[in-house]
Amino acid sequence: MRLFAAATVALVLLLGQAAGEELAEERAGQAQGDAESTESSETTTDQAVSEPPITLVHVLNPGEREYLSPNLIGVQNIAMTFLPLSMNFVNIIDAFREITAGVRYEILLNALDTKAIQPAEADIVCRLVILEKPWLRTQWGDKHRELVTSNCTDPAVNSVAGDPAEKARLLNEKYVHRSRRSANDILGRHKPYDEEAAKAQLQKSLDKLTAGEGPHYKIVKVYSASRQVDSGILTRIDADLIDGSEEQHRCIVDIWTKVWVRKDEHEITFKCRNQPVVQARHTRSVEWAEKKTHKKHSHRFDKVDHLFYKFQVRFGRRYVSTAERQMRLRIFRQNLKTIEELNANEMGSAKYGITEFADMTSSEYKERTGLWQRDEAKATGGSAAVVPAYHGELPKEFDWRQKDAVTQVKNQGSCGSCWAFSVTGNIEGLYAVKTGELKEFSEQELLDCDTTDSACNGGLMDNAYKAIKDIGGLEYEAEYPYKAKKNQCHFNRTLSHVQVAGFVDLPKGNETAMQEWLLANGPISIGINANAMQFYRGGVSHPWKALCSKKNLDHGVLVVGYGVSDYPNFHKTLPYWIVKNSWGPRWGEQGYYRVYRGDNTCGVSEMATSAVLA
């Protein structure tokens, strides 16, 4: 009896080792193939080649379960051997093996039933339980394997579907003379797909996205559809869709289906004409989403949700949790009301809409500006500007950009350093007018070396002029690049290319004096109320004074020119200032802001200053 027990244990260990060696050989073969493909692309050398490492084979103990990679060809071959002929193999979902009275494989796979009456019923999940007896061989010399149970449907065994054992016996008899099928016979190209079935599948996916947090679309018309079976099911649909903005687009929709245990996962890509590509994913049922949102059987086509999703895609917003996303969505909704109010009360031609600041609170947005308030009780430290009188009529328009006196639009990032960009822009313009050379000077030097201002926590142009004078000048941007945070000052006086003797204050509230100074000297540093700039998209901005008070200056910018927009059909003329901002070229009009000229809109002439070069 002891001898029999010992023999049984030895047999079980032998089975585990044999199975482990088989899969180890396959994995090693794959690794060797990868290595050979890599070596083929490299130049050979005369160096000695080291011996390949010894592969350690894991021996399974009785009852121990080992999960197998779905990508192993051997596992796929086993599954395809016992899959009914009426079904096309798609991919392995899950697989494991264990030592029992042999090697027991349990494989969960995704397949297509080619005999399904309704296309929507073609996608199925099969679970196969297969017993391998390696001490037995088939007539072709392969290891003997037999099907234990299967929940796959097949017309030949439907009559015994309720009896798993009988069903397995019939399937074994059916496949006893069947050789392994090639994956090339199964995986095909795009084939035409029933349009009604495609429309139903698309509608189901859209319902899930609407119920969750995805984009929102409505189907208008389906033109054509196709399917491709690979390691999953790719359904491609050509259709007209209406998005959350109530705009109709011709779109190609790709639905990539992966079937998993107890839930399915779909990756959906919307490629609409003249629109950015939108990608989404859903992994839960409509019923689950309905319970979550408490909107059972009443999915609301929410325009705001759709706009918020497009905002996330365009500006790359990623939120750390669902709670944060919901908070940002609430802020976004409130900001849409502000945008609506700005558009309704706009007296110029400006359009306000969704910008990168659309999910920020007012306080968060203010952190992206950074201008301190002047203490009106104290002297600024600057001299009163002597504005040269312009002889003759002032030009209708003027732009220092056309005179090569304005550098490219810069981006201060998530740092309240507008004051530094306003000052360097002013000095860059003055230097270009004086020397004929347009150079970029360093804002980072001011963040690091100006001890009066507070780097990313804000500052004042008045202080920056004084700091440059005391420090000894400015280095070039390339020599002292911008980091959007305060670091240790490492100013190199030998690399100072421009020096400042002081600064001047232009007459407060006098926009004609600003024009004359601009024409004679160069761009002007100003402070402005940035309320209307948060959602500015273009046009001449002329908001109500109640929405943009001249007293609340919070942003430092640069006036580089002026002009006039004429609207003869409406008998309307809009004079404006051309303002260079520091939020990058994607904001506003390629980084610029046109604000109404003539009534001190948003305090444009309240804090106008300019450096005096040494």
Swiss-Prot record:
InterPro entries: Cystatin_sf, Papain-like_cys_pep_sf, Pept_asp_AS, Pept_cys_AS, Pept_his_AS, Peptidase_C1A, Peptidase_C1A_C, Peptidase_C1A_papain-like
UniProt KW keywords: Disulfide bond, Glycoprotein, Hydrolase, Protease, Signal, Thiol protease, Zymogen
UniProt entry tagged with the keyword Transferase: no
UniProt catalytic activity: The recombinant enzyme cleaves synthetic substrates with Phe and Leu (better than Val) in P2, with high specificity constant (kcat/Km) comparable to that of cathepsin L
Keyword flag Cytoplasm: no
Molecular functions per Gene Ontology: cysteine-type endopeptidase activity; cysteine-type peptidase activity
Top-tier EC class: hydrolase
Enzyme Commission code: 3.4.22.41
Biased composition (Low complexity): 29-45
Positions annotated as active site in the UniProt record: 418, 555, 581
Similarity comment: family membership: Belongs to the peptidase C1 family.
Entry function: May have a role in autophagic cell death.
Protein name per Swiss-Prot or TrEMBL: Cathepsin F
Organism whose genome encodes this protein: Drosophila melanogaster (Fruit fly)
Gene that produces this protein: CtsF
